[in-house]
Each structure stands twice: as C-alpha cells, then as structure tokens.
UniProtKB/Swiss-Prot annotation:
One of its GO terms (cellular component) is ribosome. It comes from the Bacteria. Part of the 30S ribosomal subunit. Interacts with proteins S7 and S18. Binds to IF-3. The keyword rRNA-binding applies. Pfam families: Ribosomal_S11 (PF00411). This is Small ribosomal subunit protein uS11.
Length: 127
C-alpha cells in the first residue's frame, strides 16, 4: 500500500497580522491571522497540555501566546494588532507574552460582545 502523501506546509511571508485572544473562564485561545482573517498560527492552553482549572490561569495564557507567536514568526510576521475577547484571567498576560516573544504590538482592541439585554445569564453558583 502506498504511503499517504503529506502536504508540505507553505511558508507565507506576511509582515503584519492580527492576534485574536479569546479568553474565557475555562481556557485561553490565541489565533494569529493575516489582515484578511486567514489563519497563520494558533495555540491554546488546552493544546499545550494544561488540563482542568490550570487552563484558565494567566501562566497558561502566556504559554499559549508564546507558542502562537513563535509559530507565526516562522512565517515572517513582525507586527500585530491585538483583539481581545472575553472576561478570562489570561487577557493581560497573553498580550504581554506576544510583545515579549518579539512581535511589535501596534494596537490593542477589546471586542468582547456585550448584550443589549439578550439571553438570560446562568444562575449564580452556590459553593
């Protein structure tokens, strides 16, 4: 039987892009796209092996940001605009990690969706 051919990853030469940070209460997902929204690199706390409540920590968000930035820099990325969505604890540390990884952060935008009194929120937890 013939070996399945593996598709070679094409190295894209992209100078600037957008880093989308989705910080939920349970996880942090970092996706880096070009200006048109095509994905270049992504990472998340769960994909790096953090499980359970450790996924929601700022440290896990920092590691996810570093991994995504490293992968994006292989495609020639140098500057990013950051869009942050969600109320999670990894918002600040993810942005700092992108800058520390060598990407120049040009703008930070908060795009957290705010309902105009839409769906009823979940009931309060009693622990």
């Amino acid at each position: 039987m013939a070996k399945p051919t593996r598709k070679r990853r094409v190295k894209k030469n992209i100078e600037s892009g957008i880093a989308h940070i989705h910080a939920t209460f349970n996880n942090t997902i970092v996706m880096i796209t070009d200006v048109h929204g095509n994905a270049i690199a992504w990472s998340s706390a769960g994909a790096l092996g953090f499980k359970g409540s450790r996924k929601s920590t700022p440290f896990a968000a920092q590691m996810a940001s570093e991994a995504a930035a490293k992968s994006a820099q292989e495609h020639g990325l140098k500057t990013v605009e950051v869009t942050v969505k969600g109320p999670g604890s990894g918002r600040e540390s993810a942005i700092r990690a992108l800058a520390a990884a060598g990407l120049e952060v040009t703008a930070i935008r908060d795009v957290t969706p705010v309902p105009h009194n839409g769906a009823r929120p979940p009931k309060r937890r009693r622990v």
